[in-house]
Amino acid sequence: MKFLVILTLCIAGAIAHCDKAPFIKASWNQVKHNEVDILYTVFKAYPEIQDRFPQFAGKDLEAIKETAEFAVHSTRIVSFMSEIVSLVGNPAVQSSIDLLLVKMANDHKARGVTKELFEKFNIAFMGYLKSHTTWDEKTENAWKVVGDEHHAIVYSILE
């Protein structure tokens, strides 16, 4: 029931936040091809996240950063984010965003990923965005408002 309430609020919020999409898309377009750097930043900030990936657990981050396996996995993660960003701001496809987030959250929950790990991922990711894009108050607000809605869906499943 909690999930359905959150989902309803997020759908309603999507209509109210169409004005946020240009800021999210503009900043994302500046970093969406930095897949390896984004995942490297997350792993560097939170090694416990790296340890959740069996193919990278216990390995030297500097060494794996240059591997094809790291590049492929980084691209998977960033491509998912790109898909979400491409849909943001269009109320007609809000249910698609919600379904993608639900599937991702369920997949990660099945692997034992916690809300706390997602929060840490987000902290590192947002830090990367802020330091690698043209960042201002409107951009920060857009990411916060839309991000909070998306995180509510994910966290309702991970809790």
UniProtKB/Swiss-Prot annotation:
Keywords assigned by UniProt, alphabetized: Heme, Iron, Metal-binding, Oxygen transport, Signal, Transport
Ranges of residues in domain Globin: 17-159
Species name: Chironomus thummi piger (Midge)
Further details from the record: There are at least 12 different components in Midge globin.
Disulfide bonds, paired cysteine numbers: none
SUPFAM superfamilies in the cross-refs: Globin-like
InterPro entries: Erythrocruorin, Globin, Globin-like_sf, Globin/Proto, Mb-like_M
One GO cellular component, as annotated: extracellular region
One GO MF term attached to the UniProt entry: oxygen binding
Binding site for heme b: H73, H108
Stretch forming the signal peptide: 1-16
Family the entry assigns: Belongs to the globin family.
PROSITE patterns: GLOBIN
Highest classification ranks of the organism: Eukaryota, Metazoa, Ecdysozoa, Arthropoda, Hexapoda
Domain of life where this protein originates: Eukaryota
Protein name, UniProt field: Globin CTT-W
